[in-house]
Amino acid sequence: MRTIEIRKVSITFLDTDAIVNAANEGLFAGGGVCGAIFKAAGYEQLQKACDRIGHCDTGSAVITPGYNLKSKYIIHAVGPRWKDGRHKEPEQLYGAYYKSLELAAANHCGSIGFPLISAGIFGYPVHAAWRQAFDACGDYLDQHKDVSLHIVFAALSDEIIETGQKTLLESGASRYKIAGRNDWARLDMPEQRDTFIFQRTFTAQQMASLRHGHIPRQMEDKWFWFMEGDTLFAHRSWTGFCIFRIDFKPDNHHVVTVNRNPDQYTCTSTAEDAQKLNELLNWWIQDPYDYYHEWLDETADALKAAGKNIPEKHPSIIIR
């Protein structure tokens, strides 16, 4: 799973394999996030571990056990104090994140939790701090395609979270964002609906791809989907109509609710629905999801149904 998400939670409550402490160069307990982590981990034992290390340069990171935390490790990352942005603050903040990710991977972590480093008492502007965070995380995942790492950012301020969500969508790391209901314009499932049982087995990796969801980015992106708990909501990107809702079940007999408003979805047969859904899921469980060739397939099928002559589905559609 190679994903990025933002949660409204105290970082000390995360159960990721590692959490990151917004540390200082002396590695002593401070205020804010740092103080909360020391308190939750156990001040005396964590301070002893930090004292053995002694120092960490700004823009770098070191690692200690997590002690009383749910996380196995604490990565202590030292971000810069904000001056004016012209004293290597962006490079140092980027480095603190990147080094933290390297340490997480080196210690076989599958997940890591970050605070918004330097945005508290160190005074780094929130939007700029988010930008460096996402640039570093996106670059790391791009450059280490063999690493499976789920990245969680923990924050408590609604304003900081909202800024983070917007900045993530604007950044190059947006493809790693876990989709949520507020990431795209959408409509709820109408009252006109049917349900049927859909039997299919999914691997853990395939379910991880579905849980990642998908936020459309190109005109050819025809679907927006996201998961809440064990329920997947699939919306048409151009209209926002909710076409399918899938409640995944442990026995692999999943409950599907399908849109029956003829102005939103024209299919009326559950057999056709099941076939269509199965085809869609074959695309959506891919990592990465190939929306463009899904669009080619779907467009080709529609043109064929309309009696058009289509010599080839791939790599292009030609109408005679």
Go through the PLM ranges and name each one.
Residues 173-229, 317-319:
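Negatively charged, low-complexity tracts enriched in Asp/Glu with abundant Ser/Thr
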Residues 107-110, 227-230, 249-253:
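A short, structured loop/turn motif at beta-sheet edges
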Residues 231-250:
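Canonical SH2 domain fold
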Residues 252-320:
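Polybasic, proline/glycine-rich intrinsically disordered low-complexity segments
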Residues 61, 225, 246-248:
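A structural signal for short hydrophobic beta-strand segments in well-ordered beta-sheet cores
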Residues 1-106:
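Glycine-/small-residue-enriched capping loops at alpha/beta junctions
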